[in-house]
Structure formats: C-alpha cells, structure tokens
C-alpha cells in the first residue's frame, strides 16, 4: 500500500496535464500512487494521461466538478495520506518529502501545506510567494473563519483519517452548486486537528482568470450568499469577515497580475488585467487609476504610481 495517494481531477486539461503528472513522478519521495479523475473532458486529456501507462490510474466520470472528482479519487485510493493536485499546477521535487515529513512528525496534525509561487494561466510567473505578512503560520480555526487564508488544494497533504472524519469535499449545499469547496474543506479539516505550514514555495499555482469567467460573476455572488448563510448557521456572525474576503479575492489577484505586467513593461497585459478587476469590483477606485496609468508615458506613470509598485506584494490575493 502506498503511503501517499496523489489525486488529480482534470477537465479539458490537455495543455497542462502532462507537466502536472511529470512533476509528481519527479518527487524525491517515490512511495505514492497517482490517480487522475477525468471529469468528462472533451479534449485530449484522457489520451495524454493514458500515455503514462501504469504510472497513472485513470478514472473517468461524467462532468461533476473538481470536488466530486477529488472525492471519487479518494474512494479509489489506498494511501495513508491524500494529496489533491489540480491539473494545471506543478510540484517542486521536494513537495512530498517536506509534507510527509511534517505529518509524520506530529500525529495530531490533520493537514500540512506549503507556500506557493504564483503564475498566470499561461505559466508566466507573477510572484515567488503567495503567502504574505500575517499569513506565514498555520491558522487557528477562528483565523480561518475571519480571513481568507492562502491554502491552495495543490499545496496540501491530508491525513486520510481526518479526511474521512470530516466527510471530504462538499460539492453541493442546500441544493445549490457549491463554489467554495476549498475554503469549506479547510475549515472542516481544521476542526479535525491543527495544520502544519511549510514556509517554502514548493508548488507553482496557476491562477486562471479568463474573460468568459466574468460572465459567471453573478453566479459567483449568488453562490457566495448561499455559503454565507451556511456559515452563519454553523458559526454565527463571527464568519462574516471571511465572506467579505472571499468576494475581494478575484479582484485582488487580477490587480496583482496587472501590477506585475506593468513592472515588466507589458502595458496591454496590465491594461487587460486592470479592466477585468474593474468589472469584478467597479467601486474600487484604485484599479481605475492603475488602468489610466497603462496609457501614460513612462515618466508620468511613474510619478503617479506613488507607493503602488512598492506595495505590489501586498496587493496579491487575500491581502488587498
């Protein structure tokens, strides 16, 4: 029986799935199984996964979303620890070594997670660290309920007993499509035991924000209200700050992408990112000013930038 089951939910991931699987195969710890759950892909994802032969076990399901895919993979797995790796993210070679070591060192831990490097949907680096000041420690439960903690699914290693006890990922809530399964899962896992934080960027997390997703923002807001009602029912008004932070997250990440592009001199890319951030939150004046800067001559833009460039790291997701 392998110590670790690596579960990769994939939907139309033909462009990235090979690199994701190869990053698992390259781990310094080799006591694992890889399970890829294809979520009804219509591209070449399945064909690419099959090229890995018996290194990857393929499970195919009707399109049901990543939460259902993770749970399905867990049901077919046998490892003591579970790792949920998204099909467009990649691990550094030491990810499993560090994460397994953390859980082995303290049987009370329910989950270990690490810092992340951040890239856009095309793999272009945005930042070397997702976790900023004030978030560089394992959270208490009340911190998870009041702040949007930067814990990416791909950056976690989960103790199976804790996963089973919390019921896994939630893929529906009161009949509504559930959009915040990652946040919900972390809260449920923290109820099972403390976390360990590894202060190294051992994965590259790709933030995929495409123009077509802007059309889904009304659904995002509707789902957020459902999530808010659930949190209030379970935890009371103490979780209200988490809902506010969850709403700000897409805007903050887009602003980070725009600032990085602006520093790199890529004005069209910066302009597009700020424009999307404005659509996400039209009441955020700062992003209008940033968008205007992309049209100005360099010298004038720099004179108007104020502290923006120096605050680029603090503008990343979860902190703006």
Enumerate the predicted regions with their spans.
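Cell-envelope/extracellular polymer assembly enzymes that use nucleotide-activated donors
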Residues: 2-5, 23, 33, 184
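A conserved acidic beta->alpha catalytic loop
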Residues: 23, 30, 38-47, 63-64, ...
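Conserved donor NDP-sugar-binding/catalytic core segment of glycosyltransferases
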Residues: 94-127
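Conserved nucleotide-sugar donor-binding catalytic segment
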Residues: 132-218
């Amino acid at each position: 029986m392998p110590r670790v089951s690596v579960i990769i939910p994939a939907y139309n991931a033909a462009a990235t799935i090979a690199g994701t699987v190869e990053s698992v195969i390259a781990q310094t710890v080799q006591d694992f199984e890889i399970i890829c759950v294809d979520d009804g892909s219509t591209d070449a994802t399945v064909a690419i996964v099959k090229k890995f032969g018996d290194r990857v076990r393929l499970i195919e399901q009707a399109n049901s979303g990543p939460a259902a895919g993770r749970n399905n993979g867990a049901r077919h797995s046998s490892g003591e620890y579970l790792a949920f790796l998204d099909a467009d993210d990649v691990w550094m070679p030491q990810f499993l070594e560090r994460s397994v070591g953390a859980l082995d060192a303290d049987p009370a831990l329910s989950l270990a997670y690490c810092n992340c490097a951040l890239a856009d949907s095309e793999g272009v680096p945005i930042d070397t660290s997702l976790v900023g000041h004030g978030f560089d420690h394992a959270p208490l439960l009340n911190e998870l309920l009041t702040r949007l903690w930067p814990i990416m699914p791909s950056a976690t290693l989960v103790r199976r007993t804790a996963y089973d006890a919390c019921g896994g990922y939630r893929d529906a809530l009161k009949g509504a499509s559930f959009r915040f399964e990652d946040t919900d899962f972390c809260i449920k896992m923290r109820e099972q035991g403390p976390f360990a934080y590894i202060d190294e960027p051992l994965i590259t997390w790709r933030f995929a924000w495409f123009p077509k997703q802007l059309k889904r923002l009304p659904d995002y807001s509707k789902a957020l209200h459902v999530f808010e009602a659930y949190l209030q029912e379970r935890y009371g008004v103490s979780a209200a700050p988490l809902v506010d932070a969850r709403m700000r997250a897409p805007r903050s990440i887009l602003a980070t992408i725009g600032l990085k592009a602006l520093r790199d001199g890529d004005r069209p890319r910066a302009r597009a990112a700020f424009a999307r951030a404005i659509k996400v939150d039209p009441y955020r004046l700062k992003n209008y000013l940033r968008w205007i800067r992309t049209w100005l001559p360099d010298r004038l833009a720099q004179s108007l930038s104020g502290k923006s460039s120096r605050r680029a790291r603090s503008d990343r997701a979860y902190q703006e």
